[in-house]
Amino acid sequence: MPMPLNQLLPAAESGVLIRELTLDSRKVRPGDLFLAVPGTQQDGRVHIADAVARGAAAVAFEAEGAAPMHAESAVLVPVKGLAGQLSAIAGRFYGEPSRALHLIGVTGTNGKTSVSQLLAQALDLLGERCGIVGTLGTGFHGALEQGKHTTPDPVGVQATLASLKQAGARAVAMEVSSHGLDQGRVAALEFDVAVFTNLSRDHLDYHGSMEAYGAAKAKLFAWPNLRCRVINLDDAFGRELAQQAHDSRLIGYSLSDASAFLYCSEAQFDDHGVRARLVTPRGEGVLRSNLLGRFNLSNLLAVVGALLGMDYGLDEILKVLPQLQGPAGRMQRLGGGDKPLVVVDYAHTPDALEKVLEAMRPHVQGRLVCLFGCGGDRDRGKRPLMAAVAERLADVVWVTDDNPRSEDPAQIVADIRAGFCAPEQVQFIHGRGDAIARLIAQAEAADVLVLAGKGHEDYQEITGVRHPFSDLIEANEALAAWEAAHA
């Protein structure tokens, strides 16, 4: 519904009707409000003339440092500190959708996608239709539209929530990235439950230090009117977070601390998944899931904690857990049986790679083989750390490309190589498709092959161009060739 400009922006005198909001001048249509803010890569104010030419009814722009400007056909509104107000402005325009939804924010270095996807499935099964916003896209489980960022821009977030609400969502599970928190993309949302999975090295190219990275994550747990905090007590930063005094209810979960609100004992892992006894102040029960790995058991506890925080009963929660499926590219299994078992996972940090390799070790009868790379234009410091993890936990290690972006792939490989004690034992192959094909071709039926880093991604980004590429497709084709060769 169009809204008068002076209702949307108190500083505006004009009541011109605004049809839509946009931060991108190329998307402006007649009647829109163009929001021009300085960004990390470019200043939106340089595109004001373009927005006006495309028919913008009004332009709100950052007043600080702005050059004098004039437009005949559009209302210009200078706003000091506009970037910090974008979420609130968009919230007003789209009818404050988060207030009408059960909004669950999930943050952490690893596990955000799995927890949000599992939580949405569980809520659907419990009769509360749940939307999803995150790395795999936005929408509903099984029908996601891919987006560019884990957490969309402030206007995109509010528009997405309004769209999900209109489509019938009563709840939304949202991945909340540290960038999103630091840049105020979710500033005016009303979260009911906040979930913390873990904190390990990532994004230091942006945050500069682990302290700044952790501080960005911590913002979500001091949110106004938050009802419940669900925190992983097996994580050192999680324990710090849990000790901070807030009005919201705390549900801590742990695989090792029997004093936690949610505690798993007697966990049994096999090729079919996990079975464990769940101990809570509300009683005990048996948790069953077909997901692999200890870290996925931790993810399931996060889901249970969020559902308890939303006042679902333990018995009804435990009934739906066996029906939950892991998201695409997260510990996704291909082959197995009389063929090599290939596991495709998004692990792209040292901690995530460690967890995946440790999770797969009990399933190995032959060799545990790890193929990985590191993304270009990202934290260089983690590259040798990932090499050390792979060398320590896998029997065989192959290194290849993983979204080199604008960097020279040879430089990325050199950074990784520095982390190996015995680099002469490692295969280095540029061309990820070729590496996957050769790796699977030489595998034995008893081997477990972990393809780490890209997971669900359907592209390889090289010098700014995203070329179609999928680990899942490449692995399936290579497994078919392996089967033909061993027939």
From Swiss-Prot:
<feature type="binding site">
    <location>
        <position position="185"/>
    </location>
    <ligand>
        <name>UDP-N-acetyl-alpha-D-muramoyl-L-alanyl-D-glutamate</name>
    </ligand>
</feature>
<keyword id="KW-0961">Cell wall biogenesis/degradation</keyword>
<dbReference type="InterPro" id="IPR013221">
    <property type="entry name" value="Mur_ligase_cen"/>
</dbReference>
<keyword id="KW-0131">Cell cycle</keyword>
<dbReference type="InterPro" id="IPR036565">
    <property type="entry name" value="Mur-like_cat_sf"/>
</dbReference>
<dbReference type="Pfam" id="PF01225">
    <property type="entry name" value="Mur_ligase"/>
</dbReference>
<dbReference type="InterPro" id="IPR036615">
    <property type="entry name" value="Mur_ligase_C_dom_sf"/>
</dbReference>
<feature type="binding site">
    <location>
        <begin position="150"/>
        <end position="151"/>
    </location>
    <ligand>
        <name>UDP-N-acetyl-alpha-D-muramoyl-L-alanyl-D-glutamate</name>
    </ligand>
</feature>
<dbReference type="Pfam" id="PF02875">
    <property type="entry name" value="Mur_ligase_C"/>
</dbReference>
<feature type="binding site">
    <location>
        <position position="23"/>
    </location>
    <ligand>
        <name>UDP-N-acetyl-alpha-D-muramoyl-L-alanyl-D-glutamate</name>
    </ligand>
</feature>
<keyword id="KW-0963">Cytoplasm</keyword>
<dbReference type="InterPro" id="IPR000713">
    <property type="entry name" value="Mur_ligase_N"/>
</dbReference>
<dbReference type="GO" id="GO:0009252">
    <property type="term" value="P:peptidoglycan biosynthetic process"/>
</dbReference>
<feature type="binding site">
    <location>
        <position position="453"/>
    </location>
    <ligand>
        <name>meso-2,6-diaminopimelate</name>
    </ligand>
</feature>
<comment type="similarity">
    <text>Belongs to the MurCDEF family. MurE subfamily.</text>
</comment>
<dbReference type="GO" id="GO:0000287">
    <property type="term" value="F:magnesium ion binding"/>
</dbReference>
<dbReference type="InterPro" id="IPR035911">
    <property type="entry name" value="MurE/MurF_N"/>
</dbReference>
<feature type="binding site">
    <location>
        <position position="378"/>
    </location>
    <ligand>
        <name>meso-2,6-diaminopimelate</name>
    </ligand>
</feature>
<keyword id="KW-0067">ATP-binding</keyword>
<dbReference type="GO" id="GO:0071555">
    <property type="term" value="P:cell wall organization"/>
</dbReference>
<dbReference type="GO" id="GO:0008765">
    <property type="term" value="F:UDP-N-acetylmuramoylalanyl-D-glutamate-2,6-diaminopimelate ligase activity"/>
</dbReference>
<feature type="binding site">
    <location>
        <begin position="108"/>
        <end position="114"/>
    </location>
    <ligand>
        <name>ATP</name>
    </ligand>
</feature>
<feature type="short sequence motif" description="Meso-diaminopimelate recognition motif">
    <location>
        <begin position="402"/>
        <end position="405"/>
    </location>
</feature>
<keyword id="KW-0573">Peptidoglycan synthesis</keyword>
<feature type="binding site">
    <location>
        <position position="183"/>
    </location>
    <ligand>
        <name>UDP-N-acetyl-alpha-D-muramoyl-L-alanyl-D-glutamate</name>
    </ligand>
</feature>
<dbReference type="GO" id="GO:0008360">
    <property type="term" value="P:regulation of cell shape"/>
</dbReference>
<dbReference type="Pfam" id="PF08245">
    <property type="entry name" value="Mur_ligase_M"/>
</dbReference>
<keyword id="KW-0547">Nucleotide-binding</keyword>
<dbReference type="InterPro" id="IPR005761">
    <property type="entry name" value="UDP-N-AcMur-Glu-dNH2Pim_ligase"/>
</dbReference>
<keyword id="KW-0436">Ligase</keyword>
<keyword id="KW-0132">Cell division</keyword>
<feature type="modified residue" description="N6-carboxylysine">
    <location>
        <position position="217"/>
    </location>
</feature>
<comment type="pathway">
    <text>Cell wall biogenesis; peptidoglycan biosynthesis.</text>
</comment>
<feature type="binding site">
    <location>
        <position position="25"/>
    </location>
    <ligand>
        <name>UDP-N-acetyl-alpha-D-muramoyl-L-alanyl-D-glutamate</name>
    </ligand>
</feature>
<dbReference type="InterPro" id="IPR004101">
    <property type="entry name" value="Mur_ligase_C"/>
</dbReference>
<feature type="binding site">
    <location>
        <begin position="402"/>
        <end position="405"/>
    </location>
    <ligand>
        <name>meso-2,6-diaminopimelate</name>
    </ligand>
</feature>
<protein>
    <recommendedName>
        <fullName>UDP-N-acetylmuramoyl-L-alanyl-D-glutamate--2,6-diaminopimelate ligase</fullName>
        <ecNumber>6.3.2.13</ecNumber>
    </recommendedName>
</protein>
<keyword id="KW-0460">Magnesium</keyword>
<keyword id="KW-0133">Cell shape</keyword>
<dbReference type="GO" id="GO:0005737">
    <property type="term" value="C:cytoplasm"/>
</dbReference>
<comment type="function">
    <text>Catalyzes the addition of meso-diaminopimelic acid to the nucleotide precursor UDP-N-acetylmuramoyl-L-alanyl-D-glutamate (UMAG) in the biosynthesis of bacterial cell-wall peptidoglycan.</text>
</comment>
<feature type="binding site">
    <location>
        <position position="457"/>
    </location>
    <ligand>
        <name>meso-2,6-diaminopimelate</name>
    </ligand>
</feature>
